[in-house]
Amino acid sequence: ASGEVVYDLPPVSSVAEAASFLESASGLHGHTLARMAAGYANDGSGSTMETLWYHAFCLPPRLGGMHLQRPLQNVPLEWPDEVSALVSHQTMRPDFFWALYRAACEHQGKDHASEEALAEDCNRARDYELCGIDYFPVTKKDAHSEKAVRAFLAQLVEKFAPYEGPSFKRRMRQRLDDPDVVLARSVLLSQLMPASQRWHDEDA
């Protein structure tokens, strides 16, 4: 497919609308699995890689996820008035934002490789810092293997731990390293990684 990319279009549907439909469609074949899938879905994903990372963050461990708190996805953030004259953007929409943890995550694709795009990424990082938000950019290298995904998830766990109870880090580390969860995470990546984003030797 080719053509102009159009942004900010309204979504065709929402998780709430899908769940509402399934509530009234109990006689359909596959209804139980469809309701389960709707329960795991989230509104706001803007790309296949965002969808992959969302599932790695939030699915139950038996399905390859960490079962972290659900982030907001591509929801505009308003900056505090005291920094409005300092930031480069008056609002931003991080791919993922956890308000409780004051953390944002964004996937950086190939369109972030030019000098202009790199400057924009630097401005975004500084804006997050000025507003007291920890910023975690990810690239396809961070998703090129289960081990790489696990390493990034471990960084998020370290960031989130001070906001949680004393058992949080222990539970998350168990999920990171449990052999059954590692296998499920590998299966998840094999199913969701788009061919265009797969890591090749020439990317090193």
Name these PLM-found stretches.
Residues D8-A204:
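Surface segments flanking catalytic/ligand-binding clefts of nucleic-acid enzymes
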